[in-house]
Amino acid sequence: MDRLSGIASDQDVRRVASGPSVHTQARRTRVAKLYFRYGAMNSGKSTGLLQTAYNYEERSQRVLLIKAVVDTKGEDSVVSRLGVSRRVDLLVDADDDLRALVRRRALAGAQPVCEAGGAQREAVSLREVLDCVLIDEAQFLTALQVDQLMEIALIDDVPVLAYGIRTDFRTVSFPGSRRLLEIAHSLEELKTICRCGRKAIFNARKVGESFVFDGDQVAIDSGEVTYESLCGKCYLAAGGRLSGQ
């Protein structure tokens, strides 16, 4: 795997990931943004997130990994379909204030900040102790929590990279994805292919070997419930309906 594949698509993110340490003055010139990297299931979102975390940490920069409690796959870990996994730093509920949680976690027990001349002081701002926030399955966040991620980027000056899918198995958008599409500075589609070879854009739910198009919006793939990424043509052929009609 290309060691830069997790961040190569956005030049400004690449500059952050390859730039100076959190303790250097040059870091303060960075302009932080909220990024949304989305795609159908099996498009490599979790793999990309884990690669991005590795790229930052290889440069001695600090990251914070987040996922929603409702995502029970892997329990407290981000798990890619390649078998790579990593424990997250924060599991969040729908009523959690993400900015407050991130600040509390990152600043708690942070190492003293080195000033010019060798003097040390206690860290008081998030950007002094954190280089990037990474969110897996960001579609499970609330719209308010996405706004809080934007505040981390704009107010705390820390880049936020959110990975997730746009729509559920009925082609209805998730609240978190909808808000990310509305306000994120940068949108990047991660592509995968349908069984027919076309680009997959929908996530079809299966129970056993049969496609289903009714049920709760959230059903984590495990046991009998699985998902298949389909193009629009194959989605309709399988019995799917375009819910906007």
Give the positions of each predicted feature.
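A short acidic, amphipathic alpha-helical/loop segment
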Residues: T52, L144-I152, G176
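Sensor-1/coupling segment of RecA-like P-loop NTPase cores
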Residues: A153-G176
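Walker B beta-strand of ABC/ABC-like P-loop ATPase nucleotide-binding domains
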Residues: V133-L134
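Conserved P-loop
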Residues: A26-V113, G117, D168-R179, E189-T192, ...
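Residues immediately C-terminal
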Residues: F140-L141
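Short recognition patches in nucleic-acid-associated and regulatory proteins
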Residues: I193-I220
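Walker B catalytic acidic pair
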Residues: E137
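Short basic (Lys/Arg) and small-residue
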Residues: A184
